[in-house]
Amino acid sequence: MSSHTRTQRLSVPQLVAMKGRQKIVSLTAYTSHMARLMDPFVDFILIGDSTAMVGYGRTSTLDMSLAEIIAHTRAVVAGSRLACVIADMPFGSYQESPQQAYRNCAEVMARTGCAALKLEGGRALAPTVEFLVQRGIPVMAHIGLMPQFVNQMGGFKAQGLDSEAARKIEEDARAHLEAGAFSLLLEGVAEPLARRISDFSPMPTIGIGASPACDGQVLVTEDLLGLGGPQVPRFVKQYADAGALISQACERFAAEVREQAFPQLQHCYGVVQEA
């Protein structure tokens, strides 16, 4: 279903039904303004815990609170009208137990109006996914390169490059599908592995640094716009240099203020215009 033909917000079942029919498009957002701009063109908007890095300048996604996710998700829901809205659950908000996960996931959904939640974890997380799904919370399972496991993985490294690592990720995928996840997000995994998972999965796979064979693709919007900083992941394609445009606009503003070219009377209130 093309976003250009929709008149209502895309639902999770409609997103699932796109598998095998149309590629799914997603970008990240954490403000209402950005959500409004991308809304006509994407199928779902992801409020990623990557906001900790691209929005707040932190060194990892681990330093993202539940309150921050709720605030940013509320903004994205308010700024969008057509796209399905999916929020990341932050580190430490769901790993302790299925009960903890349900309390926090239910709070995010109730307070924001988002349609689903994304959780990172391998097959050990599958019982939690099943617990949530059985209680009405749609879950997108994030496997492969999992930024919340950055300390355990030793950095942001591609996953599934050897047969044993690939086998474990494939087992993660099957466990989450059996648990009832409506989608799999595959990040930074070997292309043949992502292709294989996409082939056997009855649910949509969303790739980021994975494979063209995935049912959909997502990117961090700041990377797409050239705002992600000097170190850009290999899987990113930059579609615009918004950073240069912003710098140019700031430079022009500063120059005009210092040269007393701005503001002019036309920018002021209560000015009597000469006849």
From Swiss-Prot:
Q: Which cofactor does it need?
A: Mg(2+)
**Which major enzyme category is it?**
transferase
Places the protein is found: Cytoplasm
According to its UniProt record, the EC number is 2.1.2.11
Q: Which InterPro entries match?
A: Pantoate_hydroxy_MeTrfase, Pyrv/PenolPyrv_kinase-like_dom, Pyrv_kinase-like_dom_sf
- Example of a GO cellular component annotation carried by this entry: cytoplasm
- Cysteine-cysteine disulfides: none
Q: Which UniProt keywords apply?
A: Cytoplasm, Magnesium, Metal-binding, Pantothenate biosynthesis, Transferase
Q: Which Pfam families match?
A: Pantoate_transf
Q: Which purpose does this protein serve, as stated in its record?
A: Catalyzes the reversible reaction in which hydroxymethyl group from 5,10-methylenetetrahydrofolate is transferred onto alpha-ketoisovalerate to form ketopantoate.
HAMAP family found in the cross-reference section: PanB (MF_00156)
**Protein name per the record:** 3-methyl-2-oxobutanoate hydroxymethyltransferase 1
| Source organism | Pseudomonas fluorescens (strain ATCC BAA-477 / NRRL B-23932 / Pf-5)
